[in-house]
């Protein structure tokens, strides 16, 4: 049996006296997909930043691709796709990808950029500055940037936020493609419908704890919704 792509044990993250994550246990098999739901302040983005190696746990353990999440070996295997505003607005689409490729020591960042722009349907706007893109186009460029080093594990923070229906459908299809490619996908979202359709499993965070976890699917949607609403009520 393959080792888990992600393993967390008694994971905690504190900011001063505030506990953002408390005693989180998590195991994500390689090539699987997980949706993480919860109200604002539940700890979703904090968890994702820990998985990306952008922040260190206060206590507990967190291994990604067989290494501590903040180790260079783990970070090289992870693609973090945050909000599209993380793009460089004055750089062209291609320049954004080439720059990211160089940061990740991609051998031929220009060729890799061209491949990704084609895959994301952005080949016709390769020279346009990212700041001129619609929300949907910017999200596609953000995904391309997150994939520039061909990561095994893809982390997405609220990618459906602000998208129109057409762009959201295209993104959902892209997530399914990433899954079929054998990548491990972790999706943070408020969107119950997307959480169910885009992942093998789902969990709900409430005040930094895992309040509920289940296999995703139509049969678990109602139970997942109840857990999400309970977490939202608890946060008020």
Indicate residue ranges for each PLM-predicted region.
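Helix-to-loop junction immediately C-terminal to a conserved catalytic motif
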Residues: 52
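Conserved ABC ATPase "signature" region
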Residues: 98, 102-125
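Conserved catalytic motifs of ABC-family nucleotide-binding domains
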Residues: 150
């Amino acid at each position: 049996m393959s080792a888990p792509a992600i393993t967390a044990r008694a994971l905690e993250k504190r900011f001063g006296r505030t506990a953002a994550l408390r005693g989180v246990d998590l195991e994500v098999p390689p090539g699987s997909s997980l949706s993480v739901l919860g109200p604002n302040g539940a700890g979703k983005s904090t968890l994702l930043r820990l998985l990306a190696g952008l922040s260190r746990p206060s206590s507990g353990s967190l291994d990604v691709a067989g290494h501590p999440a903040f180790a260079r070996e783990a970070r090289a295997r992870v693609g973090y796709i945050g909000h599209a505003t993380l793009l460089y607005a004055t750089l062209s689409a291609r320049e954004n990808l080439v720059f990211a490729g160089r940061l990740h020591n991609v051998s031929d960042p220009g060729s890799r950029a061209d491949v990704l722009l084609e895959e994301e349907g952005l080949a016709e706007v390769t020279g346009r500055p990212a700041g001129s893109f619609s929300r949907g186009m910017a999200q596609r460029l953000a995904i391309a940037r997150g994939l520039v080093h061909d990561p095994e594990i893809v982390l997405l923070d609220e990618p459906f936020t602000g998208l129109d229906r057409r762009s959201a459908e295209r993104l959902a299809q892209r997530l399914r493609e990433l899954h079929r490619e054998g990548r491990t996908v972790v999706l943070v979202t408020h969107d119950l419908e997307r959480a169910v359709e885009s992942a093998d499993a789902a969990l709900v965070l409430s005040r930094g704890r895992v309040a509920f976890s289940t296999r995703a699917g139509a049969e678990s949607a109602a139970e997942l919704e109840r857990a999400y609403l309970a977490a939202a009520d608890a946060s008020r």
